[in-house]
UniProtKB/Swiss-Prot annotation:
Contains 7 disulfide bonds. GO terms for biological process: arachidonate secretion; phospholipid metabolic process. SUPFAM superfamilies: Phospholipase A2, PLA2. Coiled coil: none annotated. Its main location: secreted. Belongs to the phospholipase A2 family. Group I subfamily. Keywords: Disulfide bond, Secreted. It comes from Micrurus pyrrhocryptus. It comes from the Eukaryota. It is found in: Secreted. GO terms for cellular component: extracellular region. This is Phospholipase A2 homolog A1. One of its GO terms (molecular function) is phospholipase A2 activity. InterPro entries: PLipase_A2_dom_sf (IPR036444).
Amino acid sequence: NFKQIIKMIQCTNTRPWXNFLDYGCY
């Protein structure tokens, strides 16, 4: 689960929040 949190942070750092679910960053 911790790795998912790190991945989520990395995704939000490179992707706009609006596209959070569009890129499957969860």
